[in-house]
Design a protein with these regions (language model features):
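Active-site neighborhoods and metal-handling regions in enzymes and metal-associated proteins
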Residues: 1-596
Length: 596
C-alpha cells in the first residue's frame, strides 16, 4: 500500500463517517514525545518520522505541520500528495481551518491522542465547527492487521542504590505537594505519563524504543492516611514471584490496562480526583466530567514531573558516573573513527556503520541498558538535518574532508546521557571554523553564566545564541531540555524556574542546508554558586574535548582559551586513568587535550 493509496482510503472513510477534515497528532494516550511503533500513525499515513508533527487531511489537501528541527528532514520524507507547513512561520492548523473550511464543517480527531490542554485549545479556536471524537481511529482502520503489536516485556526493579529514594518516600513527597499541608484524607491522582509512573514506582520497562517505560495508567491513592498505587497494566509484565512481592511491599495493586475507565467511575462522596491538563488525554477527561460523586480537581502542572526534575544526591552522583562512562566510550569511538578515516584512509565506511560502532563501545560499560535515542551521525550536508536518522537503507558514506556531527546518548542504571560533538579530520573551510567557534563560545558562555534564582531556561536562551546573532544567524531548536534519570532523554517541566538539582543539556548549533551542520552538547547540573546572593550556575558533566581543528583562534579571547585548556585538563585527569589499557584512545585523548 503506497502513500497515494493510503490517502485515497482515508478520504473514502472520512466520507463514510461524515468528516470534512481530520486532524492527526504525533502522540499516544499517554502524552509521550517518543512513541511505540504501534502509535506511529503520522509515519504510517505520511511517511514523516519526526517526533513533532500535526496533520490535517481534507478531500482536497493533506498538510503536515512540524517545527524547525525537521524542516529539512520532512521535505525528504513526505509521501507525494502531502505538503509541509512550518510551525511558527506559517499559519497554524486552526488558522488554516478558519480560512479554508466553511463554518459548521465536521472535523474528526481521536480524543485519546490529545491532552486536555491541546484539545481544549483546538475546540475553543474552532468553536464554530463540529469537532467529533473518532473512537475507532481512522488511521488504525487503514493500518489493519499489519499494525505492529505492543510489547509485553517484563519490568525491571530499580533499587534504591540508583534511585536514592524508596517508593514510600516518593509517596510522602507527592502527598506533601498535592495536599500543600492541608489534611486531605481521601483522594486519588490520575497519572498518565509513563515516565511519571516509572519514577514513582522505581520500575523500568522497554515498551518504547530508547525510553525505559511501560504502558500503564496509575491512580495514586490516599485513604485515611494510607497510601497505595493502583497500577493498570498488562499483568504479564509483572508475572514473577519477585515482582509480586515488590508490589505487595510497596502497596501496588494490579489491574488490567483497560480497567482504568471503570475504576475511575467508582468514586466516593468525599473523594477528590486530581488530574493535570497537560498529560491527561481528552477522552479520559470526558470520563472524569461524567463522574457524579466526589470532586474533580485540575492541577496547574504535572506534580510528579516537577518533583522528579529535582535530582537527589544519589541521582546526581549517578549522572556524574554515567557521563564519565560515556566520555570514556566516546573517546574510544572518536579515536577509532579517526584511525579508520585518516590512518587507514577508508572510503567504504558509512554513517550507519558509525552509529553501530558508537553503540558497540558503550556496550562495554557497566550497567549499560541501551541507547537513549536513535544515534544521529551525519556527515557533510546530513549534519545540517537537526534530527537526522541514518539507517541500513538510508545513509551516506563518511568523508574525512567534511564535517561530521555525532549526537548520541545512552541509558545507564546510574543515569541518562545526551552528548553531541562535531569533528573534522581534514582541512575545514574558514566558514566552518568561524561557525564552530561561535557555537562553542555560545556553549561556554551559558556554562560559565551565574544567574539569579527564579530564572527559566527561556530567559537565558539568548546568551548562547548571541555569538550567532552577531553575524545574523540562529538555530531552529531549543538550547536546553531536561534529562531523565534512566528515563526519557527529554524531560520537563518546561518554563519553570531553574532549581539546583535540575539536569539539563547545553546544546547550541548552526545548520547550513545542503552544506554542513554543527552542534556542541553537554549535560550540566544546576548548582548554587553564591548562597548569600542567591546566584545559581552550572556544573558541566560531560568530558569530551572540543574539536581543536575547527577552532578559529582569532575569534577566541585569552580568557576563553584558558577556560578551554582548563576543561581539557579535566578531561585528561578524569579519563586517562580509565583508558590506560587502550593506547589508541589514550594517544587520541592526549592530542585532543593538549593546550591550545
Amino acid at each position: 500500500m503506497d502513500g497515494k493509496e493510503k490517502l485515497h482510503i482515508m478520504r473514502t472513510l472520512m466520507k463514510e463517517r461524515g468528516y470534512d477534515a481530520y486532524i492527526i497528532p504525533h502522540g499516544d494516550c499517554h502524552d509521550n514525545e517518543y512513541i511505540a511503533e504501534a502509535d506511529e500513525r503520522i509515519k504510517f499515513i505520511s511517511n514523516f518520522s519526526g517526533s513533532n508533527g500535526l496533520g490535517l487531511v481534507t478531500q482536497d489537501v493533506a498538510l503536515m505541520w512540524t517545527d524547525g528541527r525537521y524542516f529539512i528532514q520532512i521535505e525528504k520524507e513526505l509521501y507525494p500528495g502531502w505538503q509541509m507547513k512550518k510551525m511558527r512561520e506559517e499559519e497554524s492548523l486552526a488558522d488554516y481551518v478558519l480560512n479554508n473550511l466553511e463554518e459548521g464543517a465536521t472535523i474528526g480527531m481521536d480524543y485519546s491522542l490529545f491532552s486536555v490542554d491541546s484539545a481544549s485549545r483546538i475546540k475553543d479556536k474552532l468553536c464554530k465547527y463540529s469537532i467529533v471524537d473518532d473512537k475507532n481511529n481512522i488511521i488504525d482502520d487503514i493500518w489493519g492487521t499489519i499494525k505492529p503489536k505492543y510489547k509485553t516485556n517484563k519490568l525491571l526493579i530499580l533499587s534504591e542504590k540508583f534511585t536514592g529514594k524508596k517508593v514510600s518516600e516518593k509517596y510522602e513527597m507527592l502527598n506533601k505537594m498535592l495536599t500543600k499541608g492541608d489534611d486531605i484524607e481521601n483522594y486519588r491522582l490520575l497519572v498518565s505519563r509513563l515516565d511519571d509512573i516509572a519514577w514513582l514506582l522505581n520500575l523500568r520497562g522497554s515498551d518504547i524504543p530508547y525510553n525505559p517505560v511501560f504502558f500503564s495508567y496509575a491512580l495514586f491513592c490516599k485513604n485515611k492516611g494510607q497510601f497505595c498505587t493502583k497500577l493498570f497494566i498488562n499483568k504479564e509484565k509483572l508475572d514473577t514471584p519477585e515482582m509480586k512481592k515488590y508490589c505487595e511491599d510497596n502497596h501496588i495493586i494490579l489491574f488490567n490496562y483497560d480497567e482504568i475507565i471503570p475504576e475511575l467511575e467508582k468514586s466516593e462522596e468525599n473523594m477528590i480526583t486530581f488530574f493535570d491538563e497537560e498529560s491527561t488525554n481528552y477522552r479520559m477527561f470526558q470520563t472524569l466530567k461524567e463522574i457524579n460523586v466526589g470532586r474533580i480537581s485540575r492541577l496547574d502542572q504535572d506534580y510528579i514531573e516537577v518533583i522528579k526534575s529535582i535530582k537527589n544526591e544519589v541521582e546526581i552522583e549517578g549522572y556524574r558516573k554515567a557521563n564519565i562512562k560515556d566520555s570514556v566510550a566516546l573517546i574510544k569511538f572518536f579515536s577509532w573513527m579517526e584511525e579508520e578515516l585518516v590512518t587507514k584512509n577508508r572510503t567504504d565506511l558509512n554513517e550507519y556503520q558509525i552509529g553501530l560502532k558508537n553503540k558497540e563501545v558503550r556496550e562495554e560499560q557497566e550497567n549499560y541498558m541501551g541507547e537513549s535515542f536513535a544515534p544521529i551521525c551525519g556527515c557533510g550536508a546530513n549534519a545540517a538535518i537537526i534530527h537526522y536518522e541514518q539507517n541500513e537503507n538510508l545513509h551516506s558514506d563518511m568523508n574525512k574532508n567534511l564535517i561530521i556531527l555525532c549526537d548520541t546518548g545512552a541509558q545507564y542504571k546510574e543515569g541518562t546521557t545526551d552528548i553531541t560533538r562535531t569533528v573534522h579530520y581534514g582541512k575545514p573551510t574558514q566558514k566552518e571554523k568561524e561557525m564552530y567557534t561561535r557555537v562553542l563560545l555560545g556553549n561556554l558562555s551559558l556554562e560559565r553564566l551565574q544567574f539569579k534564582s527564579g530564572k527559566t531556561l527561556y530567559s537565558l536562551d539568548a546568551i548562547p545564541r548571541s555569538y550567532l546573532y552577531m553575524v545574523g544567524e540562529d538555530y531552529k531548536h531549543g538550547t536546553s531540555h531536561g534529562v531523565g534519570h534512566f528515563l526519557n532523554v527529554h524531560e520537563g517541566p518546561h518554563g519553570l524556574p531553574l532549581i539546583p538539582g535540575n539536569i539539563i543539556t547545553n546544546e547550541p548549533g548552526y545548520y547550513e542546508k545542503d552544506n554542513f551542520g554543527i552542534r556542541i552538547e553537554n549535560e550540566v547540573l544546576v548548582v548554587v554558586k553564591n548562597e548569600e546572593k542567591k546566584l545559581y550556575g552550572f556544573e558541566n558533566l560531560t568530558f569530551i574535548p572540543y574539536e581543536r581543528n575547527l577552532i578559529d583562534m582569532d575569534l577566541i579571547s585569552n580568557d576563553f582559551k584558558k577556560y578551554i585548556d582548563d576543561f581539557h585538563k579535566q578531561c585528561w585527569d578524569k579519563l586517562s586513568p580509565l583508558l590506560k589499557n587502550d593506547k589508541k584512545a589514550l594517544d587520541y585523548l592526549k592530542r585532543k587535550t593538549a593546550p591550545l
